[in-house]
Amino acid sequence: MAHPHLLAERISRLSSSLEKGLYERSHAIRLCLLAALSGESMFLLGPPGIAKSLIARRLKFAFQNARAFEYLMTRFSTPEEVFGPLSIQALKDEGRYERLTSGYLPEAEIVFLDEIWKAGPAILNTLLTAINERQFRNGAHVEKIPMRLLVAASNELPEADSSLEALYDRMLIRLWLDKVQDKANFRSMLTSQQDENDNPVPDALQVTDEEYERWQKEIGEITLPDHVFELIFMLRQQLDKLPDAPYVSDRRWKKAIRLLQASAFFSGRSAVAPVDLILLKDCLWYDAQSLNLIQQQIDVLMTGHAWQQQGMLTRLGAIVQRHLQLQQQQSDKTALTVIRLGGIFSRRQQYQLPVNVTASTLTLLLQKPLKLHDMEVVHISFERSALEQWLSKGGEIRGKLNGIGFAQKLNLEVDSAQHLVVRDVSLQGSTLALPGSSAESMPGKIKQQLEELESDWRKQHALFSEQQRCLFIPGDWLGRIEASLQDVGAQIRQAQQC
């Protein structure tokens, strides 16, 4: 076996060769190549004239001496046009019912069937056996067929509850294609002089029959780690809960796992990784509605769970909550406590400052910052005489926010613990304390928990960085995963600075 990374590099170069002269079809070519290398079938949905047949034709060049068969189905297509004509001589001389299959589907490695849903029952039934068992019954004999890739195409989906659903379920990968969108790509396509029938693949990159057969065995040896299985099961359970989710058969799940194994194998890995699960977005949908739903669910899985993003945020929330509780406890100990006076016959409770508070101007710290008068405030300066008068007689109280500017009117009160509390317009409060009696620095246990969480985040980010080198996954998905991990990291770092 070639070194895994050398194999991954070779498959990448092979795909690049196949993509030459095709615009905005890289993902389709790569998935077709993956399907061919793992012996799966795929369905291309899209309007006429968007290179569906050319994509299939190109895949022939991925293999040495591969034979291709393509056919446009109509309502009048007969099995003879797909599987070969009957041998008149065998029927006449020996009374044998036998087809001449040379040049037809039973002897082709790459098969492209356009307008597949127009095929009649006789063709569909034989095709199902060919896909399922890689066998073709030719008269009294059952022959193995060499088909590595079946690409079926149409500009429409099969009707629900029709006889076509069985065939549709066998097509593991489903791609919805559209016209070339980018202006530069459209211009390049119009002016390209490349012959579509030329072989763009160097001989050294083409896959031999021996390599193909060996790889089929090695793909099956790729492991499915427990944590990846848990993600798959989570997705399956979530889909089962959604009323509009498509039905996904156990057979489709099993075939999809082999595709994930192939993705890992041709990416140079010995085990399926969470990033491979993105391929399920092209395997589990049934129609336009379910296509969007499946993509949404896999996006949630990838950006919230695959690298423990949500789990780390939950842990962070618990740590921050505990830190806030400790800060509140500390605030209760260090807050400025005023003295309650007798005032039995007074209409309002009267207070005075502690005897050790003697400065003419008092700077009191907010235990947590508040936005007051459109300013983020961390401390307030009071004239001692004004504060004493307010404690004794009530009324209006003013203070300089952050010690600057004019004194502003404040919503100040004394709570049940005899602490001064200032409130913002939404009535959120912050206890006031004298300088030097503010909350202590972050407790060691909280700091340690945040450091452990940051270490776990770095491990998950390193795992993603290592696994994201996957030819078959679009870059925009990788970008969203990276952004989700960076968001978690930023929140952890912010908590460490509090």
Swiss-Prot record:
Metal-binding is among the record's keywords: no
EC code: 3.6.1.-
Catalytic activity: ATP + H2O = ADP + phosphate + H(+)
Subunit relationships: Homohexamer. Interacts with ViaA.
The protein's name in its UniProt record: Regulatory ATPase RavA
InterPro entries hit by this protein: AAA+_ATPase, ATPase_RavA, ATPase_RavA_C, MoxR, P-loop_NTPase, RavA-like_AAA_lid, RavA_ATPases, RavA_LARA_dom
Binding site for ADP: Y23, G49, I50, A51, K52, S53, L54, E196
UniProt GO cellular component terms: cytoplasm
Gene Ontology molecular function: ATP binding; ATP hydrolysis activity
Location within or outside the cell: Cytoplasm
SMART domains membership: AAA
Alphabetic keyword roster: ATP-binding, Chaperone, Cytoplasm, Hydrolase, Nucleotide-binding
Keyword Hydrolase: yes
Gene3D superfamilies: 1.20.58.1510, 2.40.128.430, P-loop containing nucleotide triphosphate hydrolases (3.40.50.300)
Cited PANTHER family: ATPASE RAVA (PTHR32204:SF0)
Taxonomic source organism: Shigella dysenteriae serotype 1 (strain Sd197)
Known function: Component of the RavA-ViaA chaperone complex, which may act on the membrane to optimize the function of some of the respiratory chains. RavA functions as an ATPase.
Pfam families tied to this protein: AAA_lid_8 (PF17868), ATPase_RavA_C (PF12592), bpMoxR (PF20030), LARA_dom (PF20265)
